[in-house]
Each structure stands twice: as C-alpha cells, then as structure tokens.
Design a protein with these regions (language model features):
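N-terminal beta-loop-helix "entrance" segment that forms/cooperates
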Residues: 240
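Short donor-sugar binding/catalytic loops of nucleotide-sugar-dependent glycosyltransferases
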Residues: 203
Length: 250
C-alpha cells in the first residue's frame, strides 16, 4: 500500500462530508449519504442544515451507517444572528438529533474589538450543547485576515469551551489556508487543552488534504490525526479521494 493510498484512507475517516447549499432538499441529502462507498471508506460525519438532520440520520441508518455523526451549523454563514436565536437554533438542532454543532462566531464584532461578544456566543452555545453535542467553532479566518485576529479568535473559542476550532464557513472569498491553519494549531497547542481542528473550504483534492496532514503532524504529532481531534469539511474532496483509492485497488 502506497503512502498516498494510506493518506487517502485517513482523509476519508477524517471527513465531515458536507452539503450546505440553499437548494438542498431531502433528495440531495439522500444523494449525499448515498455517495458514501463503505468499501472505499466511511467519513467521520455528514454536515447538513438543521432541517435536514433527521433526513441525514434516516439515510445513514438505511445504509447501516448510524455510527457516522451528523453535524449542523448555527449562526451561519454571516455570524450576525442575535445570541438568543443562535441558542434556539442550537437546541432545536440537538432535538433533531445533531451530534455536532458548527457555530459561526460573530467575527465582525471581533474585528471591531468586541472580544467579549465572541466569548459569550461560544460559552453560551457550549452550555446549550451540554453533553449531548460537540461544539465546533468557526472563526472565519479568511475574513479575520491578520495572524493576531486569527490567534485571538482561536483563543476565545478555546476559552469558551470549543471541542474543535474550524477555519471557515466555505462561503467567503478566502476559506481554509495553510497559513491560518498553522496559527490555529499553534494556538491550540499552546493552550494545552484537548481541542480539535477542522479545515473547511478549498480542500478539494487528496493533494490539498495531504498538505494539511503534513503540517498538522509537524505541529501536533501523528496521534492528533484522528476523528476526535481533526476534521476536513468538504464536499468534492470525497470523490477525489475515492478515485485514488479505487485506482489503488485495480
């Protein structure tokens, strides 16, 4: 087995297979779940809008894939909803069966210097999740732009109780980058807390993913590359990785 094949298998196991499109419907969510080829590899989670959590759960159960987590998003994508709405969204999503909540911080408030607002959104969302759901915190690194703000947002997410810190919504001009990833991982490492990392948006090929795996190993060590601490948020990546794995089986 080549190194590329091993990496491809690892990438699938770390993936949040994602569909967050405005025209999503039950059929598209079923198609998303049906794109999983159990023989080639099973992702860690699927990520869908809250109203499709139940559809995703049923589709996974029909494929005997109930162990795959279902994630959803809150305060998405602009980070501008009032806190009470965000908490309501969170509780409804958990009632629908969401295992993981990907919260967008009010990053525009952070750019204005309102760190306390960000901390409140994270800590209150964490309380709403309780022990029922993991909290992944999206800092929208491509909009924060500066290393100082990216590090600060990561610190606030950790302080608020995030289980993972995630780069991006995938809905802005600049999404996951290796530069932002390096800052975020070093900030997580410095905290000495067991916080995971998720790269989302722009990771489209096995080659793209491999660059993130290499950087993460250098900073956090091999053991960090497990679904409990590392994820890729992606849609088209699965097809590319399956292609690599399919060719390896020929």
């Amino acid at each position: 087995m080549t190194n590329n094949t091993q990496n491809a298998m690892l990438v699938v196991s770390l993936m949040d297979l994602t569909s967050l499109n405005t025209d999503d419907n039950q059929a598209s969510i079923n198609a998303l779940v049906n794109s999983i080829d159990s023989k080639l590899g099973i992702p860690a989670a699927v990520c869908v809008f809250s109203e499709f959590v139940d559809d995703a759960k049923i589709a996974l159960a029909n494929r005997l894939l109930s162990h795959v987590k279902v994630a959803t998003v809150t305060n998405f994508p602009t980070g501008e909803a009032p806190l009470n709405e965000v908490l309501n969204e969170t509780l409804i999503a958990i009632e629908r069966g969401a295992d993981e909540i990907d919260l967008v911080i009010p990053y525009k408030a952070l750019i204005k210097g309102e760190a306390d607002t960000v901390l409140e959104y994270v800590s209150e969302s964490k309380k709403a999740c309780g022990s029922r759901a993991k909290l992944k915190v999206i800092i929208e690194s491509g909009e924060l732009k500066t290393p100082a703000l990216i590090a600060q947002a990561t610190e606030l997410a950790i302080q608020g109780g995030a289980d993972f810190v995630k780069t991006s919504t995938g809905k802005v001009a600049v999404n996951a980058t290796l530069e932002a990833t390096e800052i975020m991982l070093n900030t997580i490492k410095k905290s000495s807390k067991p916080v995971g990392f998720k790269a989302a948006g722009g990771v489209k090929t096995t080659g793209d993913a491999n660059a993130y795996l290499q950087l993460t190993t250098e900073i956090m060590g091999d053991e960090y590359l497990a679904p409990e601490t590392f994820r890729f948020g992606a849609s088209s990546l699965l097809n590319d990785v399956y292609k690599v794995l399919h060719e390896a089986q020929q």
